[in-house]
């Protein structure tokens, strides 16, 4: 993966091999050289932030995200089984705040984001809107995610820390 400019945040995917390869957003991002794909947990970069829907601390600009962001590309039915394995790695686990999925599989469902949406949300919140748009541009439904979540994403991007993210989130549900 080559960031297109020096300020792009490195994106990493742990691919659990549970999805349809033709519909896999993680694989597609790797094909376009927007993210690096890993099939072994042991090879993930230890200094990156793992987006984890099972934790309470929200991702915010206060986090040290320069070393990259990791998403777990797996079936939502397997999340409860796979994340405990990742907990052993001593990564910085952060959750994304309340957002609606814009993809055709989980459209309009809160928190049920796919890998591309998770990356885009994190990038947007961290002030890397152009990189977020670049990630979503590879999917014909990508604009739907941004349209559905425009207002909360803009507000989350103004937060300084996790506490403020959670406070803003409380306005949306």
From Swiss-Prot:
Binding-site list for S-adenosyl-L-methionine: 25, 72, 96, 115
Tell me the InterPro entries matching this sequence: RNaseL-inhib-like_metal-bd_dom (IPR007209), Tsr3-like (IPR022968), Tsr3_C (IPR007177)
GO terms assigned for molecular function:
18S rRNA aminocarboxypropyltransferase activity; S-adenosyl-L-methionine binding
Entries under HAMAP family matching the protein:
TSR3
Q: What does this protein do?
A: Aminocarboxypropyltransferase that catalyzes the aminocarboxypropyl transfer on pseudouridine corresponding to position 914 in M.jannaschii 16S rRNA. It constitutes the last step in biosynthesis of the hypermodified N1-methyl-N3-(3-amino-3-carboxypropyl) pseudouridine (m1acp3-Psi).
Family, similarity comment: Belongs to the TDD superfamily. TSR3 family.
Name of this protein: 16S rRNA aminocarboxypropyltransferase
Organism taxonomic ancestry: Archaea, Methanobacteriati, Methanobacteriota, Stenosarchaea group, Methanomicrobia
């Amino acid at each position: 993966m080559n960031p297109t400019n020096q300020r792009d945040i490195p994106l990493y995917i742990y691919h659990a091999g549970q999805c349809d390869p033709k519909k896999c957003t993680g694989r597609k991002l790797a094909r376009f050289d927007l993210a690096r794909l890993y099939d072994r947990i042991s090879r993930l970069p230890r200094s990156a932030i793992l987006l984890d829907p099972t934790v309470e601390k929200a991702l915010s600009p206060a986090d040290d995200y320069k070393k990259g962001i990791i998403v777990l590309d797996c079936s939502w039915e397997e999340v409860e089984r796979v994340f405990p394995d990742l907990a052993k790695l001593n990564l910085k686990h952060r959750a994304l705040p309340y957002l609606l999925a814009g993809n055709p599989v989980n459209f309009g469902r809160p928190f049920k984001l796919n890998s591309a949406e998770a990356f885009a949300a994190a990038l947007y919140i961290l002030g890397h809107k152009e990189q977020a748009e670049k990630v979503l541009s590879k999917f014909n439904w990508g604009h739907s995610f941004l349209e559905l979540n425009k207002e909360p994403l803009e507000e989350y991007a103004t937060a300084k820390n996790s506490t403020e993210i959670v406070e803003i989130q409380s306005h949306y549900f």
